[in-house]
Amino acid sequence: MCWHIEGKYLTEEIYDPEKTCLLEREKQTKMHVKGVFVSVVVLISGVMPTKAVAQDAESYVSDVAPILSQHCVVCHRPGGIGPFSLLDYESARSRASLIADVTRNRVMPPWKPVGPPAIFHAERRLSDDEINIIDSWFTNGAPEGTSSSQAAAVVANDSWQLGSPDLVVTMPEPYALAAGSDDVYRKFVLPVPVESPRWVKAVEIQPRSDGAIHHATIRLDTSGRARDLDADDPQPGYGGFMVESAQFPPGHVLGWSPGKRVTEQQEGLSWELATNVDFVLQLHLLPGAEELNVQPEIGLYFDDGPATLQPVSVILQSMTIDIPPGDPEYVVLDAYRLPVAIDLLAIYPHAHYLGRQMQVTATPPDGMTQTLLRIDDWDFNWQDDYRYREPPHLPAGTRIEMRYVYDNSANNPTNPHSPPEQVVFGPRSTDEMAQLLLQTLPAGEEDRQVLQQSLQLKSARDEILGYQASVRRDPGDYESRT
């Protein structure tokens, strides 16, 4: 059996040993998975050779199903973002070759950072032992095994990862996502019913939307401005840009993407949820062949007391992106020198479809550069935030640098433009961004204020450079800058 990549599609050629030729057969199922059309290979029954299986050989029930339960079915289930379900033996058996291949080559589960394991919390990758179990199971004919609890061998866990939330906030009414092919960006306002301030240590989003959500972010708005925009729109939610009054909690980023594993903030790092606040839930939605109802839920887990630690978000970015059509290696650089010492708690890189490579380094005053994050095959569909198990300590004077590489050529299979077009900085997926958010923890209040003042100057500089670049591109477009 052979697999071929043809453009954005994976095709299957099935070899018939009796005819000693390639059958003229190709089965493709086009699925709109997170904005990119891919082909799902449909393996037919009976192509796998029957083998005598040793009694101690790996089986589906005893060995493979637990791996699928833990790592795969969060996406590969009915209504999930995965293009097929893996909830039962027959579904796994018919795709045993594909499962073995993509796990052996670490294509699935998708995990983009390069480096040794156990650097980040909740890493979404298989161990070598798990990969070997799947490979051996396939090699031995993908036996089912026996168990009295076979029907429950794989469980699509629709429950909350951290148990029942202290509070569940739901959209007041579902949004009807019309059938189509163009991505939809929409904000939804969810009033939060708390009678007194609470401290939040964890947030989980349950999409409940049949694979329609590409990713989501949550911001807090106490001004009522987002609520007014929602009321002015006849449909649930509203379009356009995020209101300036809606912000992440200071030092935190609240987001969700398929396959995300939820972890609690470390002790003392909870954030304040005030009364009379609205959640502004921003959704990147993927229409399908039929209308879908979108109505996710937000689960909140409260801490017993107020936060004792106050993180600060350090942002590296470029608003001057201007990528010529056909350029296969457009490089974006930004750097920032820390005025105070910090512990680096988490890192969140962001780019769109033209992004290909990312490297983030830290060079302290002694000159010994260390890599904080490296991604060699960036995929907009699998963006994530990465929380360190052991936060690196970066002394004052450390230079943090980001280097992002973009491919705007026709050879980039994720290029949204055919033929390639000029792409500039902007919020749409067909625009580009280069952003890096670092969740940092200064030693104390004085250091926190010094860091925030320094970052305000950097943010102002970034915006000025962005406006200057926009004026150079189109001097007559004053409306977008007023």
Model segments located where?
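Short acidic/polar inter-strand loop motif in beta-rich domains
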Residues: 142-144, 286-291, 405-414
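Noncatalytic modules at the cell exterior or secretory-pathway interfaces
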Residues: 200-201, 270-286, 392-405
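Bacterial N-terminal signal peptides
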Residues: 36-47
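Extended, compositionally biased non-globular segments
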Residues: 346-424
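Aromatic- and Gly/Pro-enriched helix-to-coil junctions and flexible linker segments
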Residues: 51-195, 206, 276-282, 287-289
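Solvent-exposed, flexible loop/coil segments flanking beta-strands in beta-rich domains
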Residues: 151-212, 290-354, 416-456
